[in-house]
From Swiss-Prot:
It is an enzyme of class 2 (transferase). CDD domains: PRTases_typeI. One of its GO terms (biological process) is uracil salvage. Pfam families: UPRTase. InterPro entries: PRibTrfase_dom, PRTase-like, Upp_A, Ura_phspho_trans. The gene is upp. It catalyses: UMP + diphosphate = 5-phospho-alpha-D-ribose 1-diphosphate + uracil. The keyword Repeat does not apply. GTP binds at K38, G39, L40, V41, R42. It comes from the Archaea. It comes from Methanococcus maripaludis (strain C5 / ATCC BAA-1333). Transmembrane segments: none annotated. This is Uracil phosphoribosyltransferase.
Amino acid sequence: MIKDERWEGVYSFEDSPYLMETLTDLRKISTENISFRKGLVRLGRYMGYELTKTMEFEKMPIQTPLEKTEGVFAKDRKNVVIITILRAAFPLMEGLIKNFESAKVGIVSASRGHAPDFKIEMNYIKVPQLNPEDTVIVSDPMIATGSTLIHVLKEFRDSKPKRMMIVGVLAAPEGINAVKKEFSDVEIFVTKIDENLNKDGYIVPGLGDAGDRAFGEPFKVPMLPQMHNLE
């Protein structure tokens, strides 16, 4: 795990050959949906393991079959809330939760519109009660403009959990700048920080639309005729 000196509390995993190989597979246009999902799960599991190294542990006495000794209790690991942004973050969350089996899970449906305004729509939020001792992990594969994450984080600003983290696959400097400007104390962990955004707000070189690549392009539901009130 590498601390990026451009920001406070921003880390990447560019020093991990395993994660870089997995990311390479995700970037390839030839990678199919199921392989893409499995790759996101692997990244989430590895990064979740690395996150445990940043958490507080307490020493505790234990009794083995042979004698008394000293063990550790991962206090913070028991107070984790993982907030998943639909839909691309599901595989990432699946990997993360393998390291935090006691974690509570929140779901947020949020989407970003197209350039130039990149309007954010949030139409579903179901998140457990947050407490001062909680570590909140927001999973979102792509930190592009940062606007979606900012909208999500604003929903929980007043809860004042112990720590707030963002875990993603790729980030653009523009997105990190935007998030850190609004939430300076939020920690960001990503597999790699890419070059920049293109005019359409996509990370380049990037990996495309993570949701579409993980689950397939969405079906275009036709607008239903307006239902009349039958009462």
